[in-house]
A protein has these predicted regions:
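Extended terminal and domain-junction accessory segments
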Residues: 2-81, 190-212, 271-402, 447-453, ...
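Histidine- and aromatic-enriched segments that form or immediately flank copper-ligand environments
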Residues: 6-27, 83-196, 201, 250-281, ...
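Structural beta-strand segments of beta-rich domains
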Residues: 78, 117-121, 237-241, 391-393
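Active-site-proximal beta-strand/loop segments in catalytic clefts of secreted hydrolases
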Residues: 85, 179, 213-215, 244-246, ...
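Histidine- and aromatic-rich segments of cupredoxin/plastocyanin-like copper-binding domains
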Residues: 145, 154-157, 204, 210-334, ...
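Catalytic cores of large soluble enzymes that bind and process phosphate-bearing ligands
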Residues: 182, 231, 347
Length: 492
């Protein structure tokens, strides 16, 4: 009897093991991405509560290709040329680093334009083997100019070029970076600052400077300096620091020696910013804060992550004051003066979506492990939020993981309505790159007024490359571009 039971148990175990192996093999096979594919192929359309059939339809008579959603023609007021290349760059310390660069520098050249100007940028690829594009981070431009390989264009191969054109319609601090193999190419140096100034600059006497934070080859940088960048600013001068986090992780910035105001977030001005003293500013990966103050008679020090890397301002440009101690964290949800909002929690929304960020065991492109999920799905079987032009859209973002996720929506700015169920009580807070901490929930809203197929992804670009990527698609918009090895397009 025992032998019979043992034999039966052995058969059952063998059957279970065979079934498990068969299931694992099937799951592995199903997870593998095709050699080439369209971002429209595998995503799960989510209509956000709108009637069925309101979403994207392939081949419909009203279909519009992303190649037709381009910037204005005509004579540009500003022309720039960006040349991407492999090479070495010399840091302020004298150390040389092998990097990718635009125009031979890391960061690439600072581009400054005026509101209303037609801007033309010609990208040339000298020898970046994997190809390159330029994405204009935070600029709500036409979809065909967005610079995402495999969605809005093909990556530019070595020896090739591509022209971007857009009207500078927003005033504020933005940046540009590669969106082909971005987890690698941005980290290795393909990025730079873009500043859109008012059509009429109110006061040319302002000391207006970019402070771009990055980690290059393991070395923290402020602009091109791997130490303290020193600048001369005379007492009494109005100062505006444009803080840009081009890194993959949040960056904590402390300013000592003066009170200051946070006057803009992600390129949008705040209402009624008040003076802050000893406040730590945490910048989302990809995010921007504009800080303003009047230069005091004594030096001012900006420190990144409480390290020796930073910016020192003084009358003679030679001082290096002590590193400021961290203070309480700045909270944009309660900062500034409340002001009328175009929509709020009580508004009628045409589309209402939930975006739940999670992790689970599974396969991603044939690789086993603990994978990022969006609404329970592993890329590419993740939601695609479908909208119509003119829709008022609301999204609830929940982070159920133990990591922070700076969620970046291309082509739009989101109005932050609430955090963890508590309404924003300060200034209107518009964001294109929202830092969603572990366990947090944000409710955001935007008007769907910019047709296209737009990425919505984590701007920890390593997370995005590992599948934390989805898209928002307007009904009737199509793309002829494909992603994958044969297409040579790899947006993340």
């Amino acid at each position: 009897m025992r032998r019979v039971l043992a034999a039966g148990l052995g058969v059952s175990v063998a059957v279970l093991a065979t079934s498990l192996l068969a299931w694992l093999g099937w799951a592995w096979y199903q997870s593998r991405l095709p050699e080439t594919y369209s971002v429209m192929d595998f995503a799960i359309p989510d209509q956000g509560g709108a009637p069925p059939g309101a979403g994207h339809t392939h081949g419909a008579a009203r279909a519009t290709s992303v190649v037709d959603l381009r910037g204005p023609r005509g004579t540009p007021q500003r022309r720039f040329w960006l040349t991407a290349a492999n090479g070495t760059v010399r840091l302020a310390s004298g150390r040389t680093v092998h990097a990718l660069s635009f125009n031979g520098t890391v960061p690439g050249p600072e581009l400054r334009v005026r509101e209303g100007e037609l801007v033309e940028v010609t990208l040339r690829n000298t020898d970046v083997a994997g190809g390159v594009t330029v994405h204009w981070h935070g600029v709500d431009l036409p979809n065909g100019e967005d610079g995402v390989a495999g969605v809005t264009q093909d990556a530019v191969p070595p020896g090739g070029s591509h022209v971007y054109r857009f009207r500078a319609g927003q005033v504020g601090t933005f940046w540009y970076h590669a969106h082909q193999a971005s987890a690698t190419e941005v980290r290795r140096g393909l990025y730079g600052a873009l500043v859109i100034e008012p059509a009429i600059v109110p006061d040319a006497r302002v000391a207006d400077m970019v402070v771009a934070v990055h980690t290059l080859d393991g070395t923290p940088l402020v602009n091109a300096t791997d130490g303290v960048e020193r600048r001369a600013v005379q007492p009494g001068t109005a100062v505006r620091l444009r803080l840009i986090n081009t890194d993959n992780a949040p960056q904590r910035v402390d300013i000592g020696g003066t009170p200051f105001r946070v006057v803009a977030i992600d390129g949008t001005d705040l209402t009624g910013p008040t003076l802050l003293r000893r406040r730590t500013l945490e910048l989302a990966a990809g995010g921007r804060y504009d800080v303003a103050f009047t230069m005091p008679p004594t030096p001012v020090k900006l420190a990144v992550e409480n390290t020796l890397v930073g910016l020192a301002l003084s009358a003679d440009g030679n001082s290096d004051p002590s590193t400021p101690a961290p203070g309480p964290e700045f909270d944009p949800a309660v900062y500034g003066r409340p002001s009328p909002k175009p929509f709020d929690a009580s508004s009628h929304y045409d589309r209402v979506f939930s975006l739940d960020i999670g992790r689970k065991l599974g396969f991603f492109d044939g690789h086993p492990g603990k994978q990022w999920t969006l609404n329970g799905g592993i890329y590419p079987r993740v939601p695609m939020f479908m909208v119509e032009r003119g829709d008022l859209v609301r999204i609830s973002i929940r982070n159920g993981t133990g990591a922070v996720h700076p969620m970046h929506l291309h082509g739009h700015h989101m109005l932050v309505l609430s955090r963890n169920g508590v309404p924003v009580s300060g200034s209107r807070w518009w964001s294109d790159t929202l830092n969603v901490e572990a366990g947090e929930r944000y409710d955001v809203a935007f008007r769907a007024d910019n047709p296209g197929i737009w990425m919505d992804h984590c701007h920890n670009l390593r997370h995005a490359a590992d599948g934390l990527t989805m898209h928002i698609a307007y009904a009737g918009v199509t793309t002829p571009f494909e992603t994958g090895g044969a297409a040579h397009n790899h947006p993340e």
